[in-house]
């Protein structure tokens, strides 16, 4: 019984020590290998579109940042720190929708938010294929 309690406490401490508070990210690069990132210049209906697809977004380890002139909002945290906002604004340039893979590479740049297209792109990625296969086991 003591061993079981010890294993549970060590596991809990390990998880707490290794997990970073979502609000503490200061740069997009800190999310590498943890999340796929979607940077979006805000349009009136985009937040509702993203909210409606929250299950699919979560399943794909996708974090989105909706950028408007006055703020950046996200599904990751209630507030986005200023250094992270600056990093995000620098990454959105000629295309208002940017998908960044878990490896930190840009996977897609689009004019409009199309979740079916984004999900299809993500689902074709080798890392995503491995994630889906591991769920089946």
Describe the function of each predicted region.
Residues 2-137:
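Non-catalytic interaction/Regulatory regions outside core domains
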């Amino acid at each position: 019984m003591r061993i079981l309690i010890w294993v549970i406490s060590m596991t809990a401490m390990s998880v707490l020590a290794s997990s970073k508070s979502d609000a503490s990210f200061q740069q997009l690069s800190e999310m590498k290998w943890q999340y796929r990132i979607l940077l979006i210049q805000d349009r009136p209906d985009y937040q509702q579109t993203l909210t409606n697809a929250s299950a699919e977004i979560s399943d794909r380890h996708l974090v989105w940042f909706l950028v408007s002139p006055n703020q950046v909002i996200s599904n990751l945290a209630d507030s986005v720190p200023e250094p992270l906002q600056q990093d995000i604004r620098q990454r959105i340039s000629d295309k208002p929708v940017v998908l960044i893979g878990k490896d930190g590479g840009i996977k897609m740049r689009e004019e409009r938010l199309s979740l079916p297209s984004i999900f299809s792109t993500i689902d074709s990625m080798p890392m995503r294929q491995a994630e889906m296969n591991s769920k089946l086991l």
